[in-house]
């Protein structure tokens, strides 16, 4: 899945003890990395929409891949991941669906 023409539909939880304010998932400016649980590779994403973040509660969100040179094929339905800002784990989630645009 090196082609970037897909959307990652996921359920995420942001940790209250890791951030002061909840991220805005709807303005197209929140671009953390996802790291598959048990792996080390950083997968850059751009959250494009989602429910309002309530710390420590699961919400739905959608993200786009951003790096053409990264293999995103590990992001399959059911894949669990951490949300990283720098070296800090600020949340976690799992993939609900991978929607191909083509």
Residue ranges and their predicted role:
Residues 1-102:
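C-terminal effector/interaction modules appended to NTPase cores
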């Amino acid at each position: 899945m090196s082609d970037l023409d897909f959307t990652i539909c996921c359920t995420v939880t942001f940790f209250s003890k890791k951030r002061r304010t909840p991220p805005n998932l709807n303005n197209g400016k929140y671009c953390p990395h996802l790291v598959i649980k048990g792996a080390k590779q950083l997968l850059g994403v751009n959250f494009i929409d989602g429910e309002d973040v309530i710390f420590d509660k699961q919400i739905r969100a959608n993200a786009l891949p951003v790096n053409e040179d990264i293999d995103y094929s590990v992001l399959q339905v059911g894949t669990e991941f951490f949300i990283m800002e720098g070296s800090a784990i600020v949340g976690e989630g799992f993939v609900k669906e991978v929607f191909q645009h083509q």
